[in-house]
């Protein structure tokens, strides 16, 4: 029996609360059709107080696993009986699967971040120094990816310095905390600049100028934003005008979905231009470009 036959009828889920317009079902639906797999990926809205019972009943409800988003990532971390290395390092789970009856948890955000850069800016990990703007939950995955790929010095800048200090303390050596007032000076020797803040995204000052001058960045520097709505953020527009190589955040969303699909359906999908165009068409329809 081949892997596709074994995957027949398998179900995976996507859960959060509330479930906003997620493109994960579109991504996995595209792959299921492309691979010819008779499976499903469905959105299930679960209230925070119900998550533990939901996680405990995955097998009974016929699920092979699924994706978890806000506000359940920490609860999924606590519910998992086994964690992968990325989930342990980041402290949050976005992917669940069943293995020999045990609930396992992983985090694919760091993988997605690095794979996006690998595809769009090969050699990005040769940078000795990286500058991460923002110290929220998403920045943990970014920092883990940078450290895993050998970046020697990671500067994390945040308006609330204590948040950056907490993140630096979590990861230890090679990660340094700075206040936002230090960001400008740090740009000049950063080989990679990552925006994880909401500045310039829809509903957060979109159309406004990004408040850091990027013209002093090294000419070979790469600038990437984990935000993908809008696709071209104020940060990326400013980086492009400064002559930097830019990478948008949509690829991170697409690549982070790969490991989960393989876990649940037994086939490793590819992130292709056709998939990207499929998601961009949906974004355009929703006025999210």
From Swiss-Prot:
Enzyme class, broadest EC rank: oxidoreductase
Gene Ontology cellular-component terms listed: cytosol
Binding site for shikimate: 22-24, 69, 94, 109, 228
GO molecular-function term, one example from the UniProt record: shikimate 3-dehydrogenase (NADP+) activity
EC number, as in UniProt: 1.1.1.25
Catalytic activity, as annotated: shikimate + NADP(+) = 3-dehydroshikimate + NADPH + H(+)
Pathway: Metabolic intermediate biosynthesis; chorismate biosynthesis; chorismate from D-erythrose 4-phosphate and phosphoenolpyruvate: step 4/7
Disulfide bonds listed in the record: none
A Pfam family matched in the record: SDH_C
Residues that coordinate or bind NADP(+): 85, 134-138, 158-163, 226, 249
InterPro entries, per database record: Aminoacid_DH-like_N_sf, NAD(P)-bd_dom_sf, SDH_C, Shikimate_DH, Shikimate_DH-bd_N, Shikimate_DH_fam, Shikm_DH/Glu-tRNA_Rdtase
Recorded family membership: Belongs to the shikimate dehydrogenase family.
Subunit structure and binding partners: Homodimer.
HAMAP family: Shikimate_DH_AroE
Function: Involved in the biosynthesis of the chorismate, which leads to the biosynthesis of aromatic amino acids. Catalyzes the reversible NADPH linked reduction of 3-dehydroshikimate (DHSA) to yield shikimate (SA).
Name of the featured protein: Shikimate dehydrogenase (NADP(+))
GN (gene name): aroE
């Amino acid at each position: 029996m081949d892997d596709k036959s074994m995957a027949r009828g398998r179900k995976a889920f996507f859960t959060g609360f509330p479930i906003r317009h997620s493109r994960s079902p579109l991504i996995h639906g595209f792959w299921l059709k492309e691979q010819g797999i008779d499976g499903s990926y469905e959105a299930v809205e679960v209230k925070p107080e119900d998550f533990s019972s939901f996680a405990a009943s995955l097998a009974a409800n016929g699920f092979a696993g699924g994706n978890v988003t806000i506000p359940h990532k920490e609860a999924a971390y606590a519910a998992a009986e086994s964690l992968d290395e990325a989930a342990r390092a980041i402290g949050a789970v976005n992917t669940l699967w069943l293995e020999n009856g045990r609930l396992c948890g992983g985090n694919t955000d760091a993988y997605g971040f690095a794979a996006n850069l690998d595809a769009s800016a090969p050699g990005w990990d040769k940078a000795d120094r990286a500058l991460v703007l923002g110290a929220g939950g998403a920045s943990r995955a970014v920092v883990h990816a940078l450290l895993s790929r050998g970046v020697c010095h990671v500067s994390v800048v945040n308006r609330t310095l204590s948040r950056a200090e907490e993140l630096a303390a979590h990861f230890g050596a090679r990660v340094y905390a700075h206040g936002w007032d230090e960001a400008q000076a740090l740009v000049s020797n950063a080989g990679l600049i990552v925006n994880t803040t909401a500045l310039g995204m829809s509903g957060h000052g979109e159309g406004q100028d990004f408040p850091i001058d990027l013209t002093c960045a090294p000419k070979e520097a790469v600038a990437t934003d984990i935000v993908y709505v809008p696709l071209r953020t104020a940060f990326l527009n400013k980086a492009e005008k400064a002559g930097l190589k830019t990478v948008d955040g949509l690829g991170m969303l697409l690549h982070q979905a790969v490991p989960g699909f393989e876990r649940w359906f037994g086939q490793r999908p590819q992130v292709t231009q056709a998939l990207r165009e499929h998601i961009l068409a949906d974004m355009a329809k929703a006025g999210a470009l």
